């Protein structure tokens, strides 16, 4: 489980000192209590066993670095050394000129020291210090140790308000003062510089330091140096030189290191309040500060990988670049050992070079070129926010004080935690490293130039791969998961407390501290403005004329009485208005009810009118359809439609049935019988229509077996009007009966024509009937030919057609007359009604006029 900075996403490592903090501490509401307890945690002494272990490991690292630096210097050719010296002299020439012109002596409370010239500093070996200056440094070191011992034994005093801004970093990063904060610091004022900081930026390669080292190095700023006065700056330089001398004496060799860490540098300020300011700092002296760059001679750097080692759970040192002098390739000296107190610019002058906002400058490590770093495992964009391994504080689990993970409000048991650890073991093998083992070095040493030897790089890569394989084979302890979870939960709680996402790297910590200082300065300005305004108000007039106040009071009392009277009047008016509003509301309610009833009646009548209109439209449509149907019925006649009389050549037809026969066109008797039956039915229907009764004969319509009965003979005789094709003796008698029946039918037609002529004298038939002759043709079948008989039957049907036409015409005339008679009756009735209505209206008008006259 990797840790990343929440601003720049730089990879970080967890420090064991953070796990000593009780997370319930941050649940307190009083911030002062939190600060006091964190200060107590920061002053815990380091065990002696751990100190010895750290010293041994640092000595081993130094020996390895010296061997690698010597090998690299021996391999490097003199030609490349000369080229690099020329290159660096060209790069840093301007800075040397600036420092030669601006080099001054820092002000110290002791006797001032002389500033060496730039020519003396350009030599590969540092110049010897004067005896007076060495005695002065020893005295300062002794006072520094006494003060640090005093602060380590005495309890911490409550921090005053003025110093809380300076201790903001110390408040939220208590692990910077714990036992795992630096490489071999003994919290007693003595600084052990025998080892090289594992995460020093000036080590030559860009490594990921532990959180404690980032926090310690970030606390060193010009503000913290200047707060202690000139004494603290001189003590700092003296400590650096003394520590370097002690390291050289112990190892009897020249140490190639570009990083010197000083821990728990305690300085007592010269202010009137004589407040004790404890500033725990880790100063990283590299080639970033312009004053130090001017004093360091031209050197060529060769990258030498160092074997990673674990020092108390902290991050091992990445491959550090050893600096070799251009004059000699075998002897490698540290640039920090050649720095004298006079080479460090005074805090007052450094503060003059700050930004317009007067933000304190910090001695920051060198900004490495990221393009020169290539990872053997996988490339990482360390300063971009597009990293897929960004850490979200909201997703971190909460870890209890006993090490159990709190899931959904309850702590998981031991078995569950072990199962969880086994479940996530694959993930931990790939993403996290055990706290007890040395972590994998993810970045190779930084190549200072293109002339470095490639063999050293290959050896360092092989060593790194072997170390990675060994570390991957080591079993990850179950405690590591809970340690990481506990640390992450601590970051989460601290994030909720200070409203800043944690953890943060060194640069981001400095930025956040600067932001907090800006906010504090703004708030201080506001406080000063408010305090000045308050003082101005307090210094104002406290005594005024009582007479004027009395007059104003009387005027105000009078105005108050007037306003009270106005308020009483307004209350009375308000009551009256409320009564009026109640009355008006009652009237509005009654009017609304009347309006509702009116509109309901209106809607009902409106609906009725629409319904009546619909009914009227329906009745008019029905009347129109009935009239049209009536007209069509008037134009039709039952007899005319039922009996269609026409002709077919020489044959007369009734309903397309031929009546008669010819030699050339023989007709069957079935057709002739059916035609005679229709003729008998037509004549009988016309007689009944005209309400006429024949005198001698009675027509009996019976389809194909119709006949004519004679009534004046007793018993009555029946004459058949149908025949057959049978040839027998009885056929002779049949001809006689058939001929008599046809003669009787002609006689009936003649009687009906005479009856019609009585009603309508103008009526006449085209063919006259005289006994058995019609139109001069004999109708008998016996003793005549077929042509004559067929023609006589055609004349008979023609007379029937004329009679039918007259009946239809007469019937329409009678109907029309009846309609006119009924219409005239209706008109007469309407006229009578109108006359009566007019009379009634006149009478009513007269009565009304009389009533009006009386009134």
UniProtKB/Swiss-Prot annotation:
Record carries keyword Transcription: no
Annotated localization: Endosome membrane
Record-annotated membrane-spanning stretches: none
Pfam families linked: APG6, APG6_N
Membrane-related topology note: Peripheral membrane protein
GO biological process: autophagosome assembly; cellular response to nitrogen starvation; late endosome to vacuole transport; mitophagy; protein transport
One Gene Ontology molecular-function label: phosphatidylinositol 3-kinase binding
Composition bias, Polar residues: 144-156, 368-377, 413-445
Stretches of the chain forming a coiled coil according to its record: 538-595
Record's keyword annotation contains Coiled coil: yes
Region described as Disordered: spans on this chain: 92-212, 236-271, 294-380, 407-475, 826-855
Chief subcellular location: membrane
GO cellular component annotations of the record: endosome membrane; phagophore assembly site; phosphatidylinositol 3-kinase complex, class III, type I; phosphatidylinositol 3-kinase complex, class III, type II
Record keywords, A-Z: Autophagy, Coiled coil, Endosome, Membrane, Protein transport, Transport
Low complexity bias (residue ranges): 99-123, 131-143, 177-200, 294-348, 446-474
Function as written in the Swiss-Prot or TrEMBL entry: Involved in autophagy. May be required to recruit the atg8-phosphatidylinositol conjugate and the atg12-atg5 conjugate to the pre-autophagosomal structure.
Family recorded in the similarity comment: Belongs to the beclin family.
Protein name (database record): Beclin-1-like protein B
Organism: Dictyostelium discoideum (Social amoeba)
């Amino acid at each position: 489980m990797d840790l990343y900075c929440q601003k720049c996403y730089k990879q970080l490592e967890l420090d064991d000192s953070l796990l000593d903090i009780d997370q319930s501490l941050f649940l307190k509401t009083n911030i002062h209590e939190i600060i006091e307890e964190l200060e107590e945690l920061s002053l815990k002494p380091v065990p002696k066993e751990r100190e010895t272990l750290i010293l041994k490991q640092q000595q081993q690292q130094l020996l390895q670095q010296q061997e690698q630096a010597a090998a690299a210097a021996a391999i490097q050719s003199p030609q490349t050394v000369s080229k690099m010296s020329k290159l660096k002299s060209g790069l840093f020439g301007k800075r040397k000129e600036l420092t030669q012109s601006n080099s001054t002596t820092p002000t110290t409370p002791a006797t001032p020291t002389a500033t060496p010239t730039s020519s003396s500093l350009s030599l590969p070996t540092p110049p010897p210090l004067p005896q007076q200056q060495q005695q002065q440094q020893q005295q300062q070191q002794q006072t520094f140790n006494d003060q640090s011992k005093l602060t380590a034994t005495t309890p911490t005093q409550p921090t005053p308000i003025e110093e809380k801004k300076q201790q903001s970093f110390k408040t939220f990063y208590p692990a910077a003062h714990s036992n795992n904060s630096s490489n071999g610091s003994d919290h007693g004022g003595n600084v052990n510089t025998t080892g090289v900081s594992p995460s020093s930026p000036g080590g030559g390669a860009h490594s990921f330091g532990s959180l404690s080292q980032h926090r310690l190095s970030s606390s060193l700023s010009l503000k913290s140096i200047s707060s202690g006065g000139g004494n603290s700056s001189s003590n700092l330089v003296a400590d650096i030189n003394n520590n370097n001398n002690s390291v050289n004496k112990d190892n009897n060799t020249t140490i190639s290191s570009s990083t010197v860490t000083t821990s728990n540098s305690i300085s007592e300020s010269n202010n009137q309040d004589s407040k004790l300011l404890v500033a725990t700092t880790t100063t990283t002296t590299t080639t970033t500060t312009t004053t130090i760059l001017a004093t360091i001679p031209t050197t060529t750097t060769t990258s030498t990988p160092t074997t990673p080692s674990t020092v108390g759970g902290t991050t091992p040192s990445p491959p550090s670049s050893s600096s070799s002098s251009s004059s000699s390739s075998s002897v490698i000296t540290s640039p920090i050992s050649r720095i004298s107190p006079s080479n460090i610019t005074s805090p007052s002058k450094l503060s003059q070079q700050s930004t317009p906002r007067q933000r304190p400058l910090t001695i920051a490590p060198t900004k490495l070129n990221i393009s020169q770093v290539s990872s053997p495992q996988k490339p990482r964009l360390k300063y971009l926010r597009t990293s897929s391994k960004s850490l979200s504080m909201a997703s971190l689990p909460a870890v209890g004080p006993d090490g159990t993970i709190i899931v959904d409000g309850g702590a998981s048991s031991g078995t569950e935690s072990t199962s969880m650890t086994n479940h996530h073991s694959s993930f931990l093998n790939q993403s996290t490293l055990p706290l007890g083992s040395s972590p994998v070095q993810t970045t190779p040493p930084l190549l200072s130039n293109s002339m470095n030897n490639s063999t050293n790089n290959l050896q360092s890569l092989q060593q790194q791969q072997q170390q990675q394989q060994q570390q991957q084979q080591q079993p990850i302890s179950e405690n590591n998961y809970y340690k990481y979870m506990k640390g992450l939960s601590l970051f989460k709680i601290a994030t909720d407390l200070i409203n800043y996402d944690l953890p943060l790297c060194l640069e981001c910590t400095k930025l956040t501290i600067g932001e907090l200082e800006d906010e504090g300065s703004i708030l201080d300005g506001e406080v000063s403005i408010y305090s000045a305004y308050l003082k101005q108000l307090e210094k104002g007039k406290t005594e005024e004329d009582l007479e004027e106040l009395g007059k104003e009071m009387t005027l105000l009392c009078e105005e108050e009485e007037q306003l009270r009277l106005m308020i009483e009047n307004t209350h009375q008016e308000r009551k009256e208005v409320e009564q009026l509003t109640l009355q008006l509301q009652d009237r509005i309610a009654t009017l609304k009810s009347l309006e509702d009833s009116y509109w309901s009646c209106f809607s009902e009548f409106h609906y009725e009118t629409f319904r009546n209109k619909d009914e009227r439209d329906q009745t008019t449509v029905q009347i129109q359809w009935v009239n049209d149907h009536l007209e069509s019925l008037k134009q039709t006649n039952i007899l005319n439609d039922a009996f269609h009389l026409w002709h077919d050549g020489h044959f007369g037809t009734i309903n397309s049935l031929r009546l008669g026969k010819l030699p050339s066109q023989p007709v069957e008797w079935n057709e002739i019988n059916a035609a005679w039956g229709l003729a008998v039915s037509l004549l009988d229907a016309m007689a009944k229509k005209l309400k006429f009764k024949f005198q001698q004969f009675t027509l009996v319509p019976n389809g194909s077996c119709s006949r004519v009965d004679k009534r004046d003979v007793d018993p009555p005789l029946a004459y058949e009007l149908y025949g057959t094709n049978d040839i027998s003796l009885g056929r002779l008698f049949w001809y006689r009966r058939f001929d008599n029946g046809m003669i009787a039918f002609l006689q009936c037609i003649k009687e009906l024509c005479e009856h019609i002529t009585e009603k309508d004298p103008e009526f006449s038939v085209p063919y006259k009937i005289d006994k058995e002759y019609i139109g001069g043709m004999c109708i008998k079948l016996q003793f005549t030919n077929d042509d004559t008989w067929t023609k006589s039957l055609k004349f008979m049907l023609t007379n029937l057609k004329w009679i039918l036409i007259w009946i239809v015409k007469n019937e329409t005339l009678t109907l029309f007359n009846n309609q006119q008679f009924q219409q005239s009756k209706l008109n007469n009735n309407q006229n009578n009604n109108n006359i009566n209505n007019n009379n009634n209206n006149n009478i009513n008008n007269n009565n009304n006029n009389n009533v009006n006259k009386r009134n």
